[in-house]
């Protein structure tokens, strides 16, 4: 029984695996101000709510060190198991970038998750929608080749609302048409259709440089963009959690 935890800048995903089956999945707000005791209460309540058995092991991927520290302590105190934080060496990947230490844990774990899918060319492009959107190029059997980082769609929408006097906050749903007839539809066109064009363009450029690849989309915005991005071969919102499971099973 593995508790897999993906700590992102905006939200934290938690998945409980029994063998290779994901039996429970939660998402909570990432709060840098929460203490270990608060995370312990949250975890206790979530497990009680679903009547879940305690994990036998825990593995964390994190891009937020303060939250990582408190979450690790909370898991260890509540369940009495060691909560390991994934390092690059744990992934078994050959990280072929200028400074391998710069590669985010979530991106490397995504790469491990992607490699579980069959790819006709042995290459993968992973698109992860979060606070930032990342594009990563991966090659079988275990090579991480680099990628690109862009602003996340919700981050872009929040920035527009915060830094302009008259533009409102909106929900990121696809518009009826590219040519908006009011401010809300114009914003949705720019933020949703514009973002789809960004994704399609980046994937095309990756393929021009590296060759054909299996494109896997993950993160909260992936499902919204699925009908707008024909470049997606797979949408897997649990890719990071599955990558953590694979590391746990293969590396111990």
Curated annotation (Swiss-Prot):
Catalyzes the phosphorylation of pantothenate (Pan), the first step in CoA biosynthesis. Keywords: ATP-binding, Coenzyme A biosynthesis, Cytoplasm, Kinase, Metal-binding, Nucleotide-binding, Potassium, Transferase. Homodimer. Its cofactor is NH4(+); K(+). It catalyses: (R)-pantothenate + ATP = (R)-4'-phosphopantothenate + ADP + H(+). One of its GO terms (cellular component) is cytoplasm. It comes from the Bacteria. The gene is coaX. This is Type III pantothenate kinase. Coiled coil: none annotated. InterPro entries: ATPase_NBD, Type_III_PanK. Pathway: Cofactor biosynthesis; coenzyme A biosynthesis; CoA from (R)-pantothenate: step 1/5. It is found in: Cytoplasm. Belongs to the type III pantothenate kinase family. ATP binds at residues 6-13, 131. Its EC number is 2.7.1.33. PANTHER family: TYPE III PANTOTHENATE KINASE (PTHR34265:SF1). SUPFAM superfamilies: Actin-like ATPase domain.
